Design a protein with these regions (language model features):
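Short cationic amphipathic helices and targeting signals
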Residues: 99-109
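Helix-rich interaction surfaces within compact, conserved domain-sized segments
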Residues: 114-133, 139, 156-165
């Protein structure tokens, strides 16, 4: 499993991500994203974007780090997105109980392979990635533990370790560029 995470840990993370509070900023207003629901405000704000993603650089590999280290990683992610010519907006994710919160970036119109590569490069197991006009989807960079099979809003992405090449499986057509398994 990526990042050395056990199936039990992946299941815990998935449950946490599915219930988290996601927000993105536009015109000074923080707007909500909910996994499994469409994002019409986002679609309206960026009508030309075919898809959207949300990611952080905090706590790579799910290893808790000091705030100063997470902020440094966040700046590195911003620099990388600038180099790649990506458009992005401030965002965050928080536990419903507010016991944790992470700075995130809403990425506008990311290419699927580039987005997955950023997630891997910054040690992120879970991101959000979905096509415009469709419900927000959780994208896990791991094999699906048995406890997580069946959620229709989770994509499980597995990359070939030896080559770094990803193979398509089943996901929305414009997001199926990695070996992606949707929960049945």
């Amino acid at each position: 499993m990526p990042h050395g995470a056990s199936p039990d840990r992946i299941a815990q993370l998935t449950a946490s991500y599915l219930t988290a509070d996601y927000r993105w900023e536009h015109d000074g207003v923080w707007r909500r994203l909910v996994i499994g629901e469409p994002a019409p405000e986002l679609d309206a704000a960026f009508p030309e974007a075919p898809r959207f993603g949300l990611m952080t650089a905090a706590n790579p590999g799910q290893q808790m780090r000091a705030d100063i280290d997470n902020r440094s990683a966040d700046r590195a992610l911003q620099r990388r997105m600038d180099v790649l010519g990506l458009r992005y907006r401030p965002a965050f994710v928080a536990a419903p109980s507010r016991v944790w919160r992470a700075y995130n970036w809403l990425v506008v119109a990311p290419e699927v392979d580039a987005f997955d590569a950023l997630a891997r490069d910054f040690g992120q197991i879970g991101t959000l990635l979905w096509s415009r006009g469709t419900p927000v989807r959780l994208r896990m960079q791991a094999a699906a533990p048995e406890a997580c099979v069946g959620n229709p809003w989770v994509d499980w992405v597995m990359h070939a370790v030896d080559t770094g090449v990803a193979e398509p499986m089943s996901a929305p057509a414009d997001i199926a560029k990695a070996k992606t398994v949707r929960s049945p």
